[in-house]
């Protein structure tokens, strides 16, 4: 495992260090710009060929499309574990099976699930897993990292100070120093370690159950309100604890502002750095209002949020 400043840096390291000139890569419409922009840059600078598995109006993908898009020169599948807009969780184990059957790697963006959804890299077949510390892992901003299967060789994205092998011309080959050029955020990493103690004491599965219950309570409360449109698949037994919605044709930023100013409720409006998913959902112009639920939220807070949505919609 190597530490980074966030999942964006981790994904840049993995994508830039594993995908070479002329390679083919498969990704999805579910991705955050932290996946999309590194891929687009390699398309322009290295001639990397890109294909994207489309998402439907619920934000769902058809796994047959991964099979369909595979080519002899496919180097990797790069995809999120959970959409940061819909909360839909992708079947990473299934995708890994498809990728590995064709000799391709699987790079996973676990920004939305690390700390809140149990993840077993070996059981799922993940080659590289990238995460951020400030979301479900409850750590400080400026922390993140990537977990790497032992036989995966990533070319360093940045080089420089390493504290060891100082007389060598090149970055040390050994992990994690290979990918950790420069001074690390030691204070942030210490905070992340303290947060992990809290998570491990409670248990990721228990956190997942608590957050899912709050998310489900909110969804059940708002889905029947006239004028409210909710995005994502809520029939799946496992999903991220977020609910994205719109109220009539109201601008999502205006709704979010009213929730904050009038009701004291913090939400995220707009595009969520997920342009392809918004196009799939048909919300490019309006954006969406995203409610995110923590195991520290209460049922009373959820009920207050439902009441606020109802009041704005009336």
Give the ranges of each region predicted by the language model.
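Pyridoxal 5′-phosphate
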Residues: 1-314
């Amino acid at each position: 495992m190597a530490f980074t400043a966030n999942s964006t840096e981790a994904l840049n390291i993995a994508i830039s260090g594993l995908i070479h000139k002329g390679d083919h890569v498969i990704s999805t419409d579910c991705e955050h710009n932290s996946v999309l922009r590194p891929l687009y840059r390699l398309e322009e600078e290295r001639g990397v060929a890109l294909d994207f598995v489309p998402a439907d109006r619920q934000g769902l993908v058809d796994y047959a499309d991964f099979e369909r898009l595979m080519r002899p020169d496919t180097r990797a599948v790069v995809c999120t574990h959970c959409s940061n807009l819909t909360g839909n969780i992708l079947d990473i184990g299934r995708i890994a099976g498809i990728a590995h059957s064709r000799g391709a790697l699987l790079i996973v963006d676990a920004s939305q699930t690390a700390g809140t959804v149990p993840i077993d890299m070996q059981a799922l077949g993940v080659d590289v897993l990238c995460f951020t510390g400030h979301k479900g892992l409850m750590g400080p901003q400026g922390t993140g990292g990537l977990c790497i299967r032992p036989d995966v060789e990533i070319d360093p994205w940045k080089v420089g100070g390493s504290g060891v092998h100082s007389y060598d011309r090149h970055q040390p080959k050994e992990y994690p120093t290979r990918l950790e050029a420069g001074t690390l955020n030691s204070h942030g990493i210490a905070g992340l370690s303290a947060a992990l103690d809290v998570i491990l004491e409670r248990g990721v599965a228990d956190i997942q159950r608590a957050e899912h219950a709050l998310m489900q309570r909110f969804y059940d409360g708002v889905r029947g309100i006239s004028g409210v449109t909710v995005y994502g698949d809520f029939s799946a037994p496992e999903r991220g604890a977020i609910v994205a919605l719109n109220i009539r044709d109201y601008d999502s930023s205006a709704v979010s502002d009213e929730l904050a100013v009038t009701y004291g409720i913090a939400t995220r409006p707009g595009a969520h750095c997920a342009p392809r998913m918004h196009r799939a959902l048909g919300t490019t112009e309006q954006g969406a209002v995203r409610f995110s639920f923590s195991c520290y939220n209460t049922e009373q807070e959820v009920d207050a949020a439902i009441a606020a949505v109802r009041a704005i919609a009336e």
